[in-house]
Amino acid sequence: MTRNNQSDWSINSWRERPALHQPEYPDKEALREAATELAAFPPLVTSWEVERLKSRLGEAAEGKRFLLQGGDCAEQFQGCDSEVITAKLKILLQMSLVLVQGTRLPVIRVGRLGGQYAKPRSSATETRDGVELPSYFGDIVNRPAFDEASRHPDPWRLLRGYERSALTMNFLRALVSGGFADLHHPEYWDLAWVEHSPRAAEYQEMVMQLSDAVQFMETLTGISVGDLSRVDFFTSHEGLLLEYESALTRSVPRRDGWYNLSTHFPWIGMRTAAPDGAHIEFFSGIRNPIGVKIGPSLEPHEIRSFIEPLIDRLHPDNEPGRLTLIHRYGAAKVADHLPALIEAVRATGRQVLFVCDPMHGNTRTTDAGIKTRRFDDILLELEQSIEIHRNSDSHLGGVHFELTGENVTECTGGARGLTDDDLGQGYRSLVDPRLNYEQALEMALLIAKRIGNHA
Ligand code: PEP
Ligand code: CO
């Protein structure tokens, strides 16, 4: 039984709709076996965690909380490593504290991690020197090396992806439930980069205020800030591979409906969000909060006829926290597109949480052919989004970043002024470029007050 209005929804009803960006597995029998095995494994998250997140997202939609979502474009199996995971949790916790201070709102922290292993690709195949092979679709599908064996979509990797997700979440749960409290104390942060910025004095002042606030609160309550917020960390990934998502979707005792228990908060990518497609069909029947990416491929005058059926399918009951729209228009287009999106949603009479992903509309390729993004474009899209929402009697309720806690060089700009020529020093992403530790922290410092002014 589902709470969804459609009586014909089932865990397999998506199979009757066009499913875009699914790998073509040559061995169908192995796929069936892998999916059957997956369906028997324990879930990675619980329905009560999912419900708790949904109710917090509902409060964010009302302007009472703020969402920080971030992590890799695509996690790699080899990144399932204590340092990589710790660094990512650390930057997200630190950014969240900066945002709490600036916005004066509780911040919901959601990692793009513990399952962000599948990628939609613009082309199903890649050709090099006359050799055509399947594209790399993320580690849960195939391997990046350009040879026949590596690019072969292997259904058993679905199980390897589930296992990596479980290992990651197990470690995260241990970290957030104790021993990580120090990260809330700005005196332990890596702030060497600050002095490279013309805004150094301003940043130092903000960090000092933060430090004082943390100490004040701990003195007042006798509880460490780390302990106060210890359970508030959730996971998300793009709900792309429907074989995987449906195998981990379960009905649970004493609750109505179906929960996708591979993650707390799946989102539907821009390329798979057609209202009559398989992805919307599948996610219309599950109880999790759902994100949908909205990009500039539709013109402003077309957005209404897209949004109406989308919201009817995914958000028929106007349940608080159910639907998040993650707009990713790019700094150059957001002013043209966002007002129309806000109006189109308003016309449906439903409430959604609006989040800005300032990464995916700002991708560019350098002269040397490297995919990158400018720090200032990312900031500009965020600033414009905050302003446009405010002017439209709406509000930006969260931010969605591609970032890492490591010292990579994938995006240009920031306090150290990374240039296109610096990108070769530490470019590790196999897909989209991420903000590094310093750039991510600086971004949080820059946007916190602007969001706060509005709140
Ligand atoms: C992503 O989030 O990595 C992604 C592919 O985004 P979008 O669907 O918005 O292009
Ligand atoms: Co990406």
Language-model region placement:
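An internal, amphipathic alpha-helical element
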Residues: S177-G178, D182, V352, C356-H360
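Short, hydrophobic/glycine-enriched beta-strand segments
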Residues: F66-G71, I108
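Conserved phosphate/anionic-ligand binding catalytic regions in large, soluble enzymes, centered on
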Residues: I294-G295, P358-N362
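Active-site-facing alpha/beta catalytic cores
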Residues: A74-E75, C80-G330, R373, E381, ...
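C-terminal structured domain segments
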Residues: G413-R416
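Non-transmembrane, aqueous-exposed alpha-helical and coiled segments at domain scale
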Residues: I303-L314, R322-L353, H360-T409
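Glycine-rich, charged/polar anion/phosphate-binding loops
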Residues: R52-K54, D276-H279, P339-L341
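N-terminal basic/disordered segments at the start of proteins
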Residues: T2-F66
